[in-house]
Regions:
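Catalytic domains of carbohydrate-active enzymes, especially glycoside hydrolases
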Residues: 1-9, 113-118, 198-205
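Aromatic- and acidic-residue-enriched segments that line the glycan-binding/catalytic groove
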Residues: 11-23, 53-86, 124-143
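Aromatic- and glycine-enriched glycan-recognition loops and surfaces
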Residues: 19-41, 152-157
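Active-site-adjacent "subsite" loops/lids of carbohydrate-active enzymes
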Residues: 33-36, 46-47, 52-113
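Conserved, mostly hydrophobic/aromatic
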Residues: 38, 103, 110, 119-122, ...
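Aromatic-lined carbohydrate-recognition surfaces of secreted/lumenal glycan-active proteins
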Residues: 39, 43-56, 120-128, 147-189, ...
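Substrate-binding cleft/loops of secretory-pathway carbohydrate-active enzymes
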Residues: 56, 168, 173-217, 223
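Surface-exposed substrate-engagement region within the catalytic domains
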Residues: 198-201, 213-246
Length: 246
């Protein structure tokens, strides 16, 4: 269940503004309604989060100023470093501890306020391979391999989210739903092999195999077999993400 698509919240949040698709006078809690109805039917609900993707300039300018991301957008020392524009929208930069802490705090809030069964990251990590996205942070790091360094920043973010979930409620699952191909994940600096082979990053990987069996680039059966080879940690489960239109 998507609960945070663009630095917003389809639930009651201290850290994120109300969902962009919700009316200003919305008097109900969409997440709580879904949890109540789903649990009555014996269904589990995993809160689906986009941790880094934010909003367009027009939307950011309308964001209430009590929220951290709005404050960072208004701060010339944070806009362009902690928040970076790529394409037509802004993105959080996971290279900064303060950014990772906000993301972790948002997860803690979800797990402590709601009886969710899991938290899942969507397949949006670094939005670009362009070096200008995080030039300042990379220069300050002293690292020489940008690709490896970016993967480490994503790993730190993922670990922070995993730890936040487990500290709030060890029974709640934490999962990641990456892109369905290794090449797609490499472009986003998503270190899926580490996540599938090392404890402490996630409880499950759910790659988005939105491909048919006859797909010329990533046929379903062969791609699923590839993922089965990547998830070797006994603490990590592989679930295959499918879509209803395939």
């Amino acid at each position: 269940l998507q609960v945070r698509a663009f630095a917003d919240a389809y639930y009651t949040s201290t850290y994120y503004m109300s969902g962009l698709s919700m009316s200003a006078d919305c008097s109900f809690d969409p997440l709580q309604i879904m949890l109540t109805e789903a649990h009555q039917l014996g269904l589990s609900v995993h809160a689906w989060v986009n941790p880094l993707r934010c909003q367009t300039d027009a939307q950011m300018e309308q964001m209430p100023e009590q929220y951290p991301i709005s404050q960072w957008y208004a701060d010339e020392t944070k806009r362009g470093t902690w928040l970076v524009k790529s394409g037509d929208r802004w993105w959080l930069n996971p290279a900064y501890p303060e950014v990772r802490q906000l993301i972790a705090d948002g997860v803690t809030e979800l797990v402590t306020q709601y009886e969710i069964d899991g938290v899942q990251i969507d397949d949006y990590f670094y939005p670009t391979t362009d070096a200008s996205f995080d030039a300042a942070a990379f220069a300050e790091s002293g690292a020489s391999d940008r690709s490896a360094w970016r993967k480490e920043q994503c790993n730190l973010m993922v670990q922070a989210m995993y730890n936040a979930v487990k500290q709030a409620n060890p029974k709640v699952l934490f999962g990641i739903s990456p892109q369905g191909t290794l090449s797609g994940n490499e472009k986003q600096s998503a270190d899926v092999q580490t996540w599938g082979q090392t404890a402490g990053y996630c409880d499950y990987l759910l790659p988005q195999l939105y491909f048919g069996f006859q797909n010329s680039t990533a046929p379903f059966a062969e791609t699923a077999a590839f993922w089965a080879e990547q998830v070797t940690c006994p603490d990590v489960t592989l679930w295959i993400g499918i879509c209803t239109y395939k």
